[in-house]
Amino acid sequence: MLVPTVIEQTARGERAYDIYSRLLKDRIIMLSGDVNDQMANSIIAQLLFLDAQDNTKDIYMYINSPGGVITSGMAIVDTMNFIKSPVSTIATGMAASMASIILAEGEKGKRFALPHATVLIHQPLGGAQGQATEIQIAAEEILKTRKMINEILAKDSGQDIETIKRDTERDHYMTAQEAKDYGLIDNIMVNQNK
């Protein structure tokens, strides 16, 4: 992937940044693509860096992701909750599966979606093979994970656990307005000048 470069004029001359580094200067983190260990490590490092710089200012996390590995996503969520800086989450395009959990775990009152963003919640996906005992262990683990995810969604949305269980039984797609009504986000971002 080609990463754009931006040129800034400073008192000392010109300085070139890749676009993500320039956005980071403004406390903006881009979470895009599949959630995996490599991406999570990058997001966590950025969160820790910005929090160490100034833990009184908001961090803005723009999310456009189909989701991914639950443990990687939960590492991001745990870091968001660990640092002192408030983390504002903004869905752009798609916040699906694990990415919808990250979106909902943003600072209350600071969880947003752009008007045409889509949010998807569902139960964890997994598979198992091997001996019967190994399959049973994997099944028990995914049920524990499902319970944890449902509890997080209930806490973040204000929906009761039975509603969450029902709605995550299958893919549950939501528009930005539906995600707001459901309680996963607090507002829809629109340009007030247009």
Swiss-Prot record:
Keyword Nucleotide-binding (UniProt): no
Cell location: Cytoplasm
One Gene Ontology CC term in the entry: cytoplasm
Keyword Cytoplasm in record: yes
An example Gene Ontology molecular-function term: serine-type endopeptidase activity
Coiled-coil residues: none
GO biological process, one term: protein quality control for misfolded or incompletely synthesized proteins
Main localization (coarse): cytoplasm
EC number of this enzyme: 3.4.21.92
Active site location: S97 (nucleophile), H122
Catalytic activity: Hydrolysis of proteins to small peptides in the presence of ATP and magnesium. alpha-casein is the usual test substrate. In the absence of ATP, only oligopeptides shorter than five residues are hydrolyzed (such as succinyl-Leu-Tyr-|-NHMec, and Leu-Tyr-Leu-|-Tyr-Trp, in which cleavage of the -Tyr-|-Leu- and -Tyr-|-Trp bonds also occurs)
Keywords tagged on the record: Cytoplasm, Hydrolase, Protease, Serine protease
Functional note: Cleaves peptides in various proteins in a process that requires ATP hydrolysis. Has a chymotrypsin-like activity. Plays a major role in the degradation of misfolded proteins.
PANTHER family in the cross-refs: ATP-DEPENDENT CLP PROTEASE PROTEOLYTIC SUBUNIT
Subunit structure: Fourteen ClpP subunits assemble into 2 heptameric rings which stack back to back to give a disk-like structure with a central cavity, resembling the structure of eukaryotic proteasomes.
Family recorded in the similarity comment: Belongs to the peptidase S14 family.
Full protein name: ATP-dependent Clp protease proteolytic subunit
Species this protein is from: Lactobacillus delbrueckii subsp. bulgaricus (strain ATCC 11842 / DSM 20081 / BCRC 10696 / JCM 1002 / NBRC 13953 / NCIMB 11778 / NCTC 12712 / WDCM 00102 / Lb 14)
